[in-house]
Each structure stands twice: as structure tokens, then as C-alpha cells.
């Protein structure tokens, strides 16, 4: 992950699901010389307002997703989707593409892209994400992040003995 952060010069982090959001497992700052995104180790990233949360809901346990969708969702920015219908649309888009992407939904000037990593049964158990100031999330940068994250997701899953579901592979090929 450190290599990924250095290559992109952006914040890369892995997170695991908890009852109320995604808990930071590891982070690496790519050292961009200008404005940076920061995360505190104690932060809990909300499922509905972060790419990590959306990716987890898209590829995680369906029962967990159902329970999460039934809970209250606070509005963090004017871009935060709080309706169940909007959230289900974001989840479906992530399933179709193999990744979740958000723009100014948790913090006003932050965009991010996340993908799941999988356990030995092929279920998502966490996410790997890149967060960047929104001004740097150009279409070219997003495409580059997606390519590098797909490699990182597969490598991380393989390193923990995970099985990559064919539906995830197909989504990445189609995206």
C-alpha cells in the first residue's frame, strides 16, 4: 500500500466494517506537496457517505447491507445522499463497475474511490481506497486510481487467502 500511495501521491487506506461505519485499519500518505487529505486513526467512516462504505455495502453480506440501509443516515455535506433509494443506486453502480466513487459526500473538498478485498469464501471483508482533494480527481486520475486499486484489491485478497468472485472480475473488465 505504501508503494501505491507513493505512486499516486495521495492517501491510501484500508478499512474494516464495524456496526456504525468503516474503521481504519491502515493508512499511507503519498506525500503530495500541496493540499492533502488526512484521516485520524479513530475516525469511523460512514457507510452511506464514503467510497469505502459504499464498496463494503455493494460487495459485503446482503443481510448486513439490509440492516445498514434501515438505519438513520446523517447529512454531512450538501452532496451526501441520505435516501435509501439514492444509496441503493450508488450500491448498484458499485456492483456494476467493481468500485465505489464519491465526490464531496463526507467532506466538502474530498473525493475518493474504493474497492473491496475478499476472504476465502469470496465475501468482501474490507476495502482499500484512495482519497484525494476533489480538485485533483480528474477523469484521468480517477482512471489511474481504478487501475491501480484493482491490482491492489486482487493482491491484498490473494495475500490473505481470499477468493476473488467472478462477478467482481467481470465488473472490472467491463469498467
Where are these regions (language model features)?
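Amphipathic alpha-helical effector-binding/dimerization core
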Residues: 1-71
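Short intrinsically disordered coil segments
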Residues: 71-73, 145
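Extended hydrophobic
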Residues: 80-152, 170-172
Amino acid at each position: 500500500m505504501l508503494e501505491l500511495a507513493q505512486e499516486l501521491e495521495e492517501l491510501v487506506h484500508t478499512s474494516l466494517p464495524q456496526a456504525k461505519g468503516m474503521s481504519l485499519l491502515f493508512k499511507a500518505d503519498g506525500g503530495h506537496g500541496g493540499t492533502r487529505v488526512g484521516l485520524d486513526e479513530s475516525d469511523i467512516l460512514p457507510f452511506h457517505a464514503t467510497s469505502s462504505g459504499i464498496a463494503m455495502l455493494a460487495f459485503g453480506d446482503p443481510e448486513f447491507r439490509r440492516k445498514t440501509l434501515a438505519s438513520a443516515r446523517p447529512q454531512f455535506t450538501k452532496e451526501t445522499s441520505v435516501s435509501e433509494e439514492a444509496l441503493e443506486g450508488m450500491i448498484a453502480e458499485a456492483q456494476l463497475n467493481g468500485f465505489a466513487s464519491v465526490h464531496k459526500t463526507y467532506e466538502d473538498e474530498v473525493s475518493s474511490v474504493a474497492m473491496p478485498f475478499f476472504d476465502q469464501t469470496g465475501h468482501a471483508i474490507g476495502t482499500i481506497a484512495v482519497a484525494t482533494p476533489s480538485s485533483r480527481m480528474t477523469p484521468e486520475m480517477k482512471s489511474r486510481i481504478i487501475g491501480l486499486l484493482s491490482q491492489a484489491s486482487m493482491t491484498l485478497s490473494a495475500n490473505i487467502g481470499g477468493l476473488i468472485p467472478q462477478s467482481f472480475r467481470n465488473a472490472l473488465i467491463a469498467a
